Regions:
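Surface-exposed extracellular loop regions of Gram-negative outer-membrane beta-barrel proteins
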Residues: 201-202, 336, 387, 445-449, ...
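Outer membrane beta-barrel strand-and-loop segments of large Gram-negative receptors
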Residues: 409, 413-417, 458-471, 548, ...
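Flexible loop and strand-edge segments within Gram-negative outer membrane beta-barrel domains
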Residues: 303, 324-370, 377-378, 385-412, ...
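C-terminal beta-signal and adjacent terminal beta-strands/loops
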Residues: 634, 677, 687-711, 723-729, ...
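Transmembrane beta-barrel wall of Gram-negative outer-membrane proteins
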Residues: 263-289, 302-336, 355-383, 424-432
Length: 788
């Protein structure tokens, strides 16, 4: 209770400080908005596009030049909305550009060519904010902006936490940013950066996981990106749950700019600018170092140790006159924590301790070359690696420490990808690609929870394996109102020759003004982690075998139908119904076992597995959103779903992520403070989340005592349900523009009411008892940011 009161006290002090900031200012400041207008399909510049700032008086605007570039100067600071129009193209609406005096606004706008039949006149269409950046997506796609990631309460500038506001998506109640989509395991998520698959981009990420407590990729580096929750376009493979397709923004290529942030989670610095004045090349670099130790010292958090992490990311863009455009991107992170658990009788006596270290790195090169005005080719080479290692120590009967668990997992990859895109005309576009991944691994794990020196060796292998993927997309716009996207994805895991041929189809039909009916179907599959294929199974006679080397691919067929209604220019309604049939799912090779690998959130299994499982997910999702307009927005999402698996024993049970329902309500408003200069803004945002608790398996106390380790009662596999989870997040921010800088102070509090729902139970090896695990408690984060 003492820690909780300290958190509340700090939050109230920070809130009071925000509300009492400020001297008046009568000076109005201005900034430049500039960018490039290109064809969405061919990526060629659009000449003569008209760009206006909506509701400006007098009207402010300009037109794009021969290279598609535009510039609007002397734009007053604040929020603005852009309208982009060009003869022969759909209008493009770009809302909520935050114009600050400390940083230019640089954007790239992609426009879609109109399909006009002979005799048609006065065709007008507008692409809105919620539509996917990927023109091949017809259903279950949502674009997320960096501005939303920063604005939504409780996100901590983490895009993985931000997408939990979308219908059908929830995060881990225990504090991690694991993404559960439509009842599927977070392991089914695909992370992509700059068009290429990357490993889990989170700090403190365990083997086989897709999430973590802190994202290593700072949102200050991101451009608008896509998130997909089902029936993915043909170019996406090696995923059955969801796809996070992230794009890095391009640094300012005309002037140097700097951003500094300091908060409870970390201190970071971003710099960007041109390599040479008058040239079009640019760089963007961000470095961050953790500051959680401060909160730990204040007693505001208790991790049984101080988490330490640092990360760096960069994006270098080098256009050339005749050889196309080159870009180099990278992400690196290092994290670790030394945890100690002390005796209840003595605060100086350590009963157990663990040292957990992780690292990740990605470096890639993209080369895009325009073959014609309608076709381009993109080549990518990327190298990536991750390591997670840990030593967990306990005391034996004599009070001496022994190594109870030792892990060391190293995974590397080299990826080569080639993508060809051809916009044949306004109706037809073809996109095809080939991806080869060379996987390297050196993995080791052993455990002995009793301390007798008799270790169980569950992992000990090293080697290489290949993964081949290919795809073909065809987009056919039969009419302006009717679009078909068809294609096929192919995947072959060369380690055991498991392969999958995956047809995909999407349809988008505009019923009338602002009304769209869409449909998507497709087959999807995913390769398990190498640690699952090479896991060693210990037999009763003490011998080992590796029975999972020939394990096949887990597969899923997705069926989605959606309806979208643009109620007003600023509000829309979206509904989707879906059914997913999962098959070829890995389950324990025992007719009496209920075990299903897809119920795991991370890690691997040292059981003998076979592809005899199946499952089904179905549900209904509803979204009502009022875009940010006139300093106000709200978002309401709701999901009803059911997620079940059938193991080798033939019994259908809840999946481990079958919470059955999820809902979100987000609301926010900005207030101009003081005079008409609009240089000072107070923002207030809130988010309320309520979702069903996940099923869990109870522990067998006597068996756990005998093994000195948590032993689950498999006779009650996933039969208990965790408490429903209520979580309220709140943020308040104060932004002030000065002549050449923008300052912002923000307080962001997760679980402001400190609700404590029971999420799971675990065996405590120190107290030899079964304990309950609860949702993440209140967590305040204060952030100061300056742009100059």
């Amino acid at each position: 209770m003492q820690k909780i009161s300290k958190k509340h006290k700090l939050a109230l002090m920070l809130l009071f400080g925000l509300l009492t900031l400020a001297a008046k200012s009568n000076t109005m400041y201005f900034q430049t908005i500039r960018g490039t207008i290109v064809d969405q399909d061919s990526k060629t510049p659009i000449v003569g596009a008209n760009i206006i700032i909506m509701a400006s008086d007098p009207i402010m605007g300009t037109s794009s030049d021969a290279e598609g570039n535009f510039r609007i100067e002397k734009v007053p600071v604040g929020r603005v909305n852009l309208q982009v129009s060009c003869l022969g193209f759909e209008n493009k609406y770009i809302p909520n550009l935050v114009v600050g005096s400390g940083k230019e606004v640089v954007i790239q706008v992609e426009m879609t060519e109109l399909v006009v039949k002979l005799g048609d006149i006065n065709v007008v269409a507008t692409k809105n904010k919620e539509e996917s950046l990927n023109e091949m997506a017809t259903v279950s796609a949502k674009v997320f902006t960096v501005e939303e990631t920063k604005r939504y309460a409780g996100t901590f500038n983490d895009p993985a936490r931000m997408v939990s506001s979308f219908a059908g998506v929830t995060n881990n109640a225990e504090g991690n940013n694991d993404i559960v989509v439509r009842g599927n395991s977070p392991k089914g998520i695909l992370w992509r950066l700059e068009g290429i698959e990357i490993p889990n981009p989170n700090h403190f990420a365990g083997e086989g996981s897709s999430g973590g407590p802190i994202n290593a990729l700072n949102s200050a580096m991101l451009s608008n990106s896509d998130f997909f929750s089902g029936a993915f376009a043909p170019e996406y493979g090696n995923a059955y749950s969801g796809v996070f397709d992230m794009q890095l923004r391009t640094g300012n290529n005309e002037k140097r700019e700097y951003t500094f942030s300091a908060g409870a989670l970390g201190i970071d610095f971003t710099l960007e600018g041109p390599f040479k004045r008058g040239k079009t090349g640019s760089y963007l670099i961000n470095y961050r170092y953790s500051s959680l130790g401060i909160l730990d010292d204040l007693g505001l958090v208790d991790f049984y140790g101080v988490p330490k992490y640092q990360d760096v990311s960069f994006h270098v863009v080098l256009p050339t006159r005749n050889l196309g455009s080159f870009s180099v991107f990278g992400l690196g992170g290092k994290s670790g924590i030394l945890q100690k658990d002390y005796s209840d009788d003595s605060e100086s006596y350590v009963t157990r301790q663990g040292d957990f270290q992780t690292g990740l790195g990605v470096v890639g090169v993209n080369h895009t070359y325009l073959l014609t005005d309608h076709a381009f080719i993109k080549n990518t080479l990327a190298i990536a690696g991750t390591q997670s290692k840990g030593i967990y120590q306990m005391r034996d009967s004599l009070g001496n420490f022994f190594d109870a668990n030792i892990d060391d997992f190293v995974n590397t990859s080299v990826k080569i990808a080639v993508t060809y895109s051809n916009k044949i005309n306004a109706q037809h576009r073809i996109k095809a690609g080939l991806i080869y991944t060379d996987l390297g691994y050196d993995i080791f794990s052993k455990y002995d929870v009793i301390g007798n020196g008799n270790y169980t060796q569950s992992q000990d292998s090293r080697g290489r394996a290949g993964l081949v993927q290919g795809f073909v997309n065809w987009k056919y716009r039969l009419y302006q109102d009717l679009t078909f996207v068809s294609g096929i994805h192919y995947l072959n895991f060369l380690k055991n020759q498991s392969q999958s041929v995956e047809p995909r189809l999407g349809i988008d039909y505009q019923l009338g003004a602002g009304k769209v009916l869409s449909m998507g179907i497709g087959v999807h599959s995913k390769v398990e982690g190498i640690s699952t294929y090479d896991a060693k199974v210990k037999h009763d006679d003490g011998t080992y075998s590796s029975p999972n080397k020939d394990l096949g691919l887990a597969k899923a067929s997705h069926f989605v139908i959606g309806y979208k209604h643009q109620i007003t220019e600023q509000m829309y309604l979206k509904a989707e119904a879906y059914y997913q049939y999962l098959y070829n799912v890995a389950v324990e090779n025992s007719p009496a076992s209920p075990y299903v690998l897809n119920n795991e959130q991370q890690g691997w299994s040292d059981r003998e597995l076979i592809n005899k499982g199946k499952g089904r997910n179905y549900g209904l999702e509803l979204t009502v959103e009022r875009f940010y307009y006139n300093n106000f927005y709200f978002l309401v999402t709701g999901s009803l779903f059911d997620s079940r698996f059938t193991a080798f024993d033939g019994v259908e049970r809840n999946s481990a992520f079958n919470g059955k329902f999820a809902s979100n309500f987000l609301i926010g408003k900005e207030f101009r403070i003081g005079d008409k200069s609009k240089n000072r803004t107070l923002g207030v945002n809130a988010k309320i989340t309520y979702f069903g608790g996940n099923p869990y398996t109870p522990l067998d106390l006597q068996a756990s005592l005998d093994e000195n380790n948590g032993v689950y009662d498999m006779a009650q596999y996933l039969e208990l349900q965790g408490d429903n989870v209520f979580k309220a997040d709140f943020s308040i921010s104060y932004r002030r523009d000065r002549e050449k800088s923008t300052h912002e102070l923000k307080l962001d509090v997760q679980n402001v009411t400190n609700h404590q729902s029971k999420v799971y139970e675990y065996y405590d090896q120190g107290s030899h008892s079964i304990e309950s695990g609860y949702q993440w408690s209140i967590f305040p984060n204060v952030i100061y940011t300056i742009q100059f």
